[in-house]
Amino acid sequence: KDGPWGGGNLFAINLKEYLEKNNHKVVNNLFDEDIDLILITEPRRTSESSAFTHIDVQNYIKYINKDVLVVHRINECNERKNTKYVNKYLIEANKTADFTVFVSRWLKNLYLEQGIGVKENHVIYAGANKTIFNNKGFHNWDKKEKLKIVTHHWGANWNKGFDIYNQLDELLDDTFW
């Protein structure tokens, strides 16, 4: 999906670009009968970045292609956003997957402790789009120019580093910065 829909969406966009550049066909729905691999990144229908749910995938397996492999990428949890339903939902959705990819070891351990299946799983850290995030034109801060701060987080969720942003904001009141 185009637009600022978070890390999972950017992961999907970057993966799609990489696969297509390497002559692989990528589809964003479950209409084709010969899909080799389904990647579940957001199984919650209520999310705007969700293309399909784990139930849609189960139906695809049952009625269209029983040989498709399913990978579930997990990058969300209750502890991160102080919710109460996400972990249970993702653990249930994960039962559809053949393989699980976690975005961090911490997240993997959290879900293993909470009872997610111990099937094939790996931690794969997210990478950045090198056309955007690179050191072209980089120069060391000379402490005379204004300090420029860039964050990869966006949104109004207080659990995404607000305490750090608040400390930075207080530092900016100091004439040194």
What would you call each of these model-derived segments?
Residues 1-30:
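N-terminal subdomain of nucleotide-sugar transferases
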Residues 1-4, 41-44, 151:
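Nucleotide-activated donor-dependent transferases that construct or modify glycoconjugates
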Residues 23, 27-96, 106:
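Extended catalytic core of nucleotide-activated donor transferases of GT-like folds
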Residues 67-69, 99, 120, 176:
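Proline-centered loop/turn at the N-terminus of a beta-strand
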Residues 82-84, 112, 127-146, 160:
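Acidic anion/phosphate-binding donor-loop and adjacent secondary structure
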Residues 95-120, 128-132:
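A short, active-site helix/loop in glycosyltransferases that binds the activated sugar's phosphate group
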Residues 124:
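Hydrophobic residues at beta-strand termini and immediately following loops
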Residues 140-160, 166-170:
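Conserved donor-binding/catalytic core segment of Leloir-type glycosyltransferases
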